[in-house]
Amino acid sequence: MIIRSPEPEVKILVDRDPIKTSFEDWARPGHFSRTIAKGPDTTTWIWNLHADAHDFDSHTSDLEEISRKVFSAHFGQLSIIFLWLSGMYFHGARFSNYEAWLGDPTHIGPSAQVVWPIVGQEILNGDVGGGFRGIQITSGFFQMWRASGITNELQLYCTAIGALVFAALMLFAGWFHYHKAAPKLAWFQDVESMLNHHLAGLLGLGSLSWAGHQVHVSLPINQFLNAGVDPKEIPLPHEFILNRDLLAQLYPSFAEGATPFFTLNWSKYAEFLTFRGGLDPVTGGLWLTDIAHHHLAIAILFLIAGHMYRTNWGIGHGIKDILEAHKGPFTGQGHKGLYEILTTSWHAQLSINLAMLGSLTIIVAHHMYAMPPYPYLATDYGTQLSLFTHHMWIGGFLIVGAAAHAAIFMVRDYDPTTRYNDLLDRVLRHRDAIISHLNWVCIFLGFHSFGLYIHNDTMSALGRPQDMFSDTAIQLQPVFAQWIQNTHALAPRITAPGATTGTSLTWGGGDLVAVGGKVALLPIPLGTADFLVHHIHAFTIHVTVLILLKGVLFSRSSRLIPDKANLGFRFPCDGPGRGGTCQVSAWDHVFLGLFWMYNSISVVIFHFSWKMQSDVWGSVSDQGVVTHITGGNFAQSSITINGWLRDFLWAQASQVIQSYGSSLSAYGLFFLGAHFVWAFSLMFLFSGRGYWQELIESIVWAHNKLKVAPATQPRALSIVQGRAVGVTHYLLGGIATTWAFFLARIIAVG
């Protein structure tokens, strides 16, 4: 830490009225680009309009102006998020069975969408229990609302209106901070101040206020709900907040107020700030008192973290100093120069944030089922499957986005003349070693992981089960994973003396939590089948990384095209007369990386779906006998490719294929339609541009003959545009197919 003299007097950090508000400008499509604003000559115009509308780098090279546009766009994004949230809460208030579900969450399914009978589609309104007919939802909103203490639909209406007000406020803020008071570049680059405000404000005070809400509103209301009190009889949130005696009846230590806090007698608060671990046996969710404790602790950490960085007072950390001091014996200049990169290239900044947020999203996916946070979430199998799948897909897309923006940074913002012997330069200089080694790892993993399956298929086909890799023949137990499970299962009262239960039931220990005769969670056994599929995960993830990293490291130059940086982020080929140089741009690596990301995530969600149905989810009889949905067939069936096709894809597709005539029939139609969208993508991916240009010219000839030719000249999509349309339909078609397959299955059997 360095102590310096304080900064001079307050600096002016905004420009007043920098850009006039002009509806004429906004009404002219492509007003941000001189070329596009001229209007269309050919049909390529509409594609360029979409490609460049948000590419602020192409509108101007002024970093301050780009920063302001990004900042303003963020407010627009927040406005859309508030609008979406408002819609969710409004549906909960207007079209849902939330109050009925709250009264009996184990027998009534959540529904917040009722289909209007226009052409007979009211068949989609299935009976979700309690006499309510509607579409069963799997978003987890009901469970979240119960956890936050919402007991009636009026509260949902109020929240929906509040979200609309905030949406309007965000729209106004986006306009105000671009047209009326736009921050100067220095404000965007003041990282210490930004860290302090984001850490202490957003994360610190945000967590603290949520902890406060949980203690004063959620805990007492959930205590009543768990005890079976009718939601209409429970006092309203403001009564708990304003009347301490009400809370003191539930938690006697409340009567003492803040005295134990200031006298350091904190154990008095252990009634409602607990450290139990495990799940609440009534709801199958984490103990809400544990969650409140967690948010309070997190708030303290972030409030402290938000006071660590040096701003107007000459005390605290400076990010530049930290980065420049960060060098090891083998890393040359280390992180010197990174500060300049991250404060002048928003692509570099965004790349790191996307990589971290993507990884975090995938971690969230795993925690949502292993430590289900909300009441009655664990026994709502459709919602569990949806939340896992959703967070896995989102994480995958964010990580590919990280590679995309890293490559854009390399092409547009990287200055090789100022970088020497820092970490980035060193990585670039031995990129051949990195990529060739990574390639070797991919080949090794691919042949060995797939080879184990092929061996098993062959032995199975030849009728030699004793020679297969399985839990009953040649065992390949995941010993390291089992060791980690055991250390966590044994930790309470030994290495974690304060904890009474393990962090998650999945670690082991023999406990089972069932709610309303359904399994919420139990110890998840890992065996040979998991060992095999985990190596497929390793393989697909490493190939995705190989493609994306190669795209980044070779985005400026390669032996094939030494001057690649001059060609930009996306280009089809290195000009005429240079055969074999197509599809080498950084954009093309992102394009290919998306397909492998899709492979990776597909295997993960298939593994999860089958494993949970086979070994976790199911019913519990009065005698305590567990019957799993697929009867534990994962361990023996998933060890062959044939088993995956026969016992997972085909066997579990029966619900979606046979859904016609039932309330699940929309999933049958989506399954069909999404397959079509996916197949449509192949038309773009498997044919060349010239084919379409020739076809178009024939069609234009026919139009000319009939004198109906348009003024805008039709053109085939460029190579890059065609690939973009192809990958979009491939991914959307594939994801929607999986969605329909999963939901029809799990709603029917779960």
Swiss-Prot record:
Note accompanying the cofactor annotation: P700 is a chlorophyll a/chlorophyll a' dimer, A0 is one or more chlorophyll a, A1 is one or both phylloquinones and FX is a shared 4Fe-4S iron-sulfur center.
What EC number(s) would the UniProt record show?
1.97.1.12
Please give, as recorded in its UniProt entry, the membrane topology of this protein.
Answer: Multi-pass membrane protein
Q: Where does [4Fe-4S] cluster bind?
A: 573, 582
- Where do transmembrane segments lie in this chain? 70-93, 156-179, 195-219, 291-309, 346-369, 385-411, 433-455, 531-549, 589-610, 664-686, 724-744
- Alphabetically list the UniProt keywords: 4Fe-4S, Chlorophyll, Chloroplast, Chromophore, Electron transport, Iron, Iron-sulfur, Magnesium, Membrane, Metal-binding, Oxidoreductase, Photosynthesis, Photosystem I, Plastid, Thylakoid, Transmembrane, Transmembrane helix, Transport
Q: Which Pfam families match?
A: PsaA_PsaB
Where the protein is mainly located, per its record? plastid
GO cellular component terms given for this protein: chloroplast thylakoid membrane; photosystem I
InterPro entries associated with the record: PSI_PsaA, PSI_PsaA/B, PSI_PsaA/B_CS, PSI_PsaA/B_sf
> Where is the protein localized?
Plastid, Chloroplast thylakoid membrane
Q: Which SUPFAM superfamilies match?
A: Photosystem I subunits PsaA/PsaB
Q: What does the entry list as the binding residues for chlorophyll a'?
A: 675
What is a biological process (GO) this protein takes part in?
photosynthesis
The GO terms this record gives for MF are: 4 iron, 4 sulfur cluster binding; chlorophyll binding; electron transfer activity; magnesium ion binding; oxidoreductase activity
Q: Which family does it belong to?
A: Belongs to the PsaA/PsaB family.
Q: How does it assemble?
A: The PsaA/B heterodimer binds the P700 chlorophyll special pair and subsequent electron acceptors. PSI consists of a core antenna complex that captures photons, and an electron transfer chain that converts photonic excitation into a charge separation. The eukaryotic PSI reaction center is composed of at least 11 subunits.
Q: What does this protein do?
A: PsaA and PsaB bind P700, the primary electron donor of photosystem I (PSI), as well as the electron acceptors A0, A1 and FX. PSI is a plastocyanin-ferredoxin oxidoreductase, converting photonic excitation into a charge separation, which transfers an electron from the donor P700 chlorophyll pair to the spectroscopically characterized acceptors A0, A1, FX, FA and FB in turn. Oxidized P700 is reduced on the lumenal side of the thylakoid membrane by plastocyanin.
Q: What is this protein called?
A: Photosystem I P700 chlorophyll a apoprotein A1
**Which organism is this entry from?**
Cucumis sativus (Cucumber)
